[in-house]
Amino acid sequence: MKVLMVSEDLPGAQLGGLGKHVVTMANALLDAGHEVAILGRKAGDPAVCGFRGRFIGAIALAHPNWKESQLGCYNPVKRPWFARHLAALIARHASGFDVVHYHGHLPLVGAYVDRACPFVQTRHDQGSDCLVHLRFRGGAVCDALDARACAGCIGPAPGLLRQHVSAMAVDGYRDRTAAAFARHKTIFVSDFLRRRFQQARPGANLRRARVIPNVVDMARLQAAGSAPEPGHIVLAGRIDTGKGFEQFLAAAHARLPRQARITIVGDGPGRAGLARHYASDQITLTGWRDYDSTVALTARAQLCIVPSVCEEACSTTVLEALALGRPCLALARGGTPELLRYQRYPGQLQLAPTMAALVDAMAPLLAAPVPAFDARAPFGADVRQVLPQLLDYYAA
């Protein structure tokens, strides 16, 4: 099979979960004997992302603000304009491929891709109905469904006119996205994401949609295998809004067991502030590390914590901890409860209702050794286990 993966996130040296998923899946398809290319950005060095196949650097669509911040409202024309241009670019490169698989940030692009094109897209976040892709505002999860409420994310005091214009933009975006999902195959990385979109567009036709989770490369993870270090707690991710690092440290720093050592791996706009307030003999912020270094730290952890206060769709960080057999603590939000099915042993993934309850759960987990498990047993989110599901969907 000839597959063209498409993503605006590639190439990139610091890949998030979406970019890692695309590269992992594309390399697995290559290993299985398929012909794979990635259509990505013109800028950047393709070699740094780890893809072993042909890279087509053609996406040059910058995403300027279009003065939305200055105007205090969302522009109804902006996102459809970008989607049309990306669809035209896809059309220019789709010839000769059996599947064109888009992983990106413009879910409405499928509404502009010809019905005859074998187009599939994967939705990795809440950007199907939320223009900031996160559904998180004012330090809390946003459950608003009325498009007028979205004006509050682009300006602090939108007023009736700005609310109306923003609502036009959001409603149009959601309608075109629903049209894209009805027109072409769509993968959601969790059932949570599928349900979320249905809440925003109850009449959406999702009969062609399927849930296929994010994946990890089990062979690569096993190569980093190490014994857990007693008391070592590892947190990894971008230190940004919604990821919960600040809330976790605020709740935990004064209550750490004496033997506990916390390593926080990652960069982002919040790192400097966290380092100023919380760095100590027990708390280390390493900054960004490459993937293999981060996985090696995870393998040495006695406990992994994913403190996201936003609703994660399908946390690759949680999957990596589970794959390595490490106990993992997270909040019971978003798609994370769906990951219980990937536990190596009962109780491996513990879900807390609040940050205070999550912190309470640390000490008992640190007091117990990491349970033994069969590292050779198949892991359900290993790319080699998931690949047949993807190929079946391609062929459907």
Name these PLM-found stretches.
Residues Q198, R207-G231:
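Acidic anion/phosphate-binding donor-loop and adjacent secondary structure
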Residues A272-D292, A296:
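Nucleotide-activated donor-binding/catalytic signature segment of Leloir-type glycosyltransferases, i.e.
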Residues P353, A367-A395:
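A charged, aromatic-enriched C-terminal amphipathic alpha-helix characteristic of glycosyltransferases
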Residues A299-A313:
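Acidic donor-binding loop of glycosyltransferase active sites
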